[in-house]
Amino acid sequence: MTRKNTTTNPWAKFHGPNLGYVIEQYDLYVTGAGSVDPELQELFEIFGAPSFQDDVVTGDNTATHFSPQNTGNIEKILKVVQLVEQIRSFGHTLAHINPMEDAANGQSLIEKTMNELSDADLKAIPAKTVWQDAPEGIHTALDVIHRLKDVYTKSLAYEFSHIQDSEERAWLHQMVESNSLRQPLSNKKRTALLKRLTAVEGFEQFLHKTFVGQKRFSIEGVDMLVPVLDEIVSEGAKGGVEDVMIGMAHRGRLSVLAHVLEKPYSHMFAEFKHAKIEGAVANAGWTGDVKYHLGREQVVGNEEVSTRVTLANNPSHLEFVNPVVEGFARAAQENRKKSGLPEQDTTKSFVILVHGDAAFPGQGVVSETLNLSRLNAYQTGGTIHVIANNAVGFTTDSYDSRSTKYSSDLAKGFDIPIVHVNADDPEACLAAANLAIQYRTLFKKDFLIDLIGYRRYGHNEMDDPAVTQPQVYKKIKNHPTVRAIYADQLQSAGVLNADEVETITQFMQEELKAEYAQVPPADTSAATIHVKVPEVVAKGIQPIDTGVSIESLRAINEGLLSWPEGFNVYPKVKKILERRKDALEENGKIEWALAESLAFASILQEGTPIRLTGQDSQRGTFAHRHIVLHDTDTNETYSPLHRLPNINASFSVHNSPLSEAAVVGYEYGYNVFAPETLVMWEAQYGDFSNTAQALFDQYVSAGRAKWGQKSGLVLLLPHGYEGQGPEHSSARPERFLQLAAENNWTVANLTSAAQYFHILRRQASILGTEAVRPLVLMTPKSLLRHPLTLSTASQLSEGRFQPALEQENLGAKPNKVKRLVLSTGKMAIDLAAEIESGKHEYSLDEVHMVRVEQLYPFPAEKVQSIIKRFKNLEEIIWVQEEPRNMGAWHYMAPILFELAGDKVKTGYIGRPDRSSPSGGDPFAHKAEQELIVAHALDVKYNFRQDKQEIEVFSN
């Protein structure tokens, strides 16, 4: 049956699961119980049974010559192979990774397999049959199992089996199974680590005793977060990283500020004491924020190796800082000083995100941000995630806050390696940090450390956690701190003696006392009820000429309509583009999309980079932009804006994932870190922007007032009532207007292509200056090609953006005008269309109309000057297409009252209060819209005396 060949041994190349397969095949070959792989059958015929010889044979610990024929127990071999893989995949289930619990026990899969194998069975099998790369000193399968259990089931536990790339998975296993990851620390480094833990503990305890009852959201229980961050930052700096961006919530933030970002203790104490201290640099805006929300930027390291660390400002809306910090990093990585796409270098910066164990699985923005990690428009070359896991969210236990075993399980779906580590094992924590930074450097992908500890006090320092977790807090009360545990370990190892440990502690206490002594008494004079907005913000954006010569515009347009020879533009798109050829000639008309492209090109030629993202931004939701062309034969892409002459700034336009919150946060962060760049986010429809409401509320509208964090982000929000129902009508302008105050941003709803051209150029001109602020634009849908929104070349080449426009062909007889109509956006165009149509039977002599292009800040002086022309004015009315409780009415009402004075009535025409923004019946919509227009322009419709509105509809 077998043609035995003794000259070579082909079985040496089979190991682990592959070996198991070969043995199974040989069993089938011998018994004839099933079909055998033809190639293996030939090997069995030539070489006989698989046999293996260990490299080293010494004493009782080494298996001698071994083969299935010698032992007759193939099942034992297979079980060992199975056991090895089980330990690698499920060792974390037995690991001692929770300092508040004993090591895991019970009938796990691993233990079940272990019980089926004796030590004698394991000793009989050479190590290399189940572990090809077994380290020196590992001779038998028993040695292998002991070694792997030591690696995978102690205070470090790993989850790598979900990693799809076999090369990455092999590298991870090799790193943790070899000796390279857990090299013993030098006594010097161990002493330094103890000093660091002493500083963290001492700082927190000093705050606890000195500022009794004040909120600080202590780090105690996960103290090792600070050394972990130290290690990652330090290793990054050694690798040449210029910027490390950190995003984290309030838990442990003060300690991170003091230690990782080197904020002086005296400055921290001054904030608690409400005192002014010399040298303190305020990073807050005019309204400010609580101390545990504030960020900091600091160069750390020494003359030889240093890096800039940025801790992002953060609200208490957990995890929403994540995409903001990712945007920081991408901005830091990109060179935007050349035409074309920006040049990205992921070695220049990286992100560390510190998550909460309840927030990581609980907040949807986490998964939205993780989804960005591999996308070309958003990837940053890998983020290091650290879950500061204290096993409780305020008063909610983990079994009530997540449906998964670990808080980190969400990361598995994004192919992210996970290390769980006991926060009471300092050296294991540093090993995890080192693995994270090495993986990120090599593979440019995300990595997650689950730092499992506890929370020594309540959610805040005024909270008693024993009310809801009495048993846990009995344990915690008697549990030694990680500093105490590590100090005992160093004493037992002979690294330090008790006196030296006490000296370290006393030195820390003396330093804290000395820092506190520098803090002057509380400065009560600083308290005031008057918040002063900086003058440059208060006075708003000053008039800026934004015209571009017709010659330049024509040259740009020619370039926009050019593409490489042989590039096959889609025929329908080609027709659209060809219609633009004569747009800048004497009788030409410029539509919205062309005005935008001309604005972009002129902005780029002036040296301002542009970044535009949105779910369909390359083509445009409404098939209007076509800023990226696709070859019909090859699917290659081409953007004319990358090839225009005289440009030394980058242009990038990306289709975003189906996400609003993460993408808005990312673009906001990008703009904060790249203030010279015109960054624009476009909603697919404005209706969907409200899923990013937390970003609008906490960052875009209030970031400067709270933190002094300037942004010039542009939001493009398609808005307009066209009978498309409640999900495709409203960008909720009322919400942006409700947030409008202190000149925090500009809110506009435009009615012409030229106005769009000028406002974009105005926005670009204020970037990087103190006058900068975000721009919120209600952009058109049906108006994109509407005849009344088209502009001429001269309207682009002359003048500037106009916050308010008077309607042409009205108000020619000022003494006859009784009604002044104010409106904005599509509603204003609907009114203008009725005026231009000439089909109305009523006279328009008594009506004048103003298009309010800029809703906030409201152009009061301009409108007031118009009002003064009409001596017989009786009423000023606001007309809108949105329901009365939506749109701009509630924002406009007090403005109109003030403009009108005592003699002129003010009022509203539009839809009544409604719970839904729009109806779903297009015919009903059309009928309603016609009624609104008629009531607005026909003065026979008078206001009711008991209401300041014309009752167009009855509810």
Curated annotation (Swiss-Prot):
GO MF terms, alphabetically ordered: oxoglutarate dehydrogenase (succinyl-transferring) activity; thiamine pyrophosphate binding
Q: Which GO terms describe its biological process?
A: glycolytic process; tricarboxylic acid cycle
Swiss-Prot/TrEMBL cofactor(s) = thiamine diphosphate
* Catalytic reactions of this protein: N(6)-[(R)-lipoyl]-L-lysyl-[protein] + 2-oxoglutarate + H(+) = N(6)-[(R)-S(8)-succinyldihydrolipoyl]-L-lysyl-[protein] + CO2
Q: Which CDD domains match?
A: TPP_E1_OGDC_like (cd02016)
Q: Which Pfam families does the protein's record reference?
A: E1_dh, OxoGdeHyase_C, Transket_pyr
**Functional description taken from the UniProt entry:** E1 component of the 2-oxoglutarate dehydrogenase (OGDH) complex which catalyzes the decarboxylation of 2-oxoglutarate, the first step in the conversion of 2-oxoglutarate to succinyl-CoA and CO(2).
Question: What is the recorded name of this protein?
Answer: 2-oxoglutarate dehydrogenase E1 component
Per the record, the gene is odhA
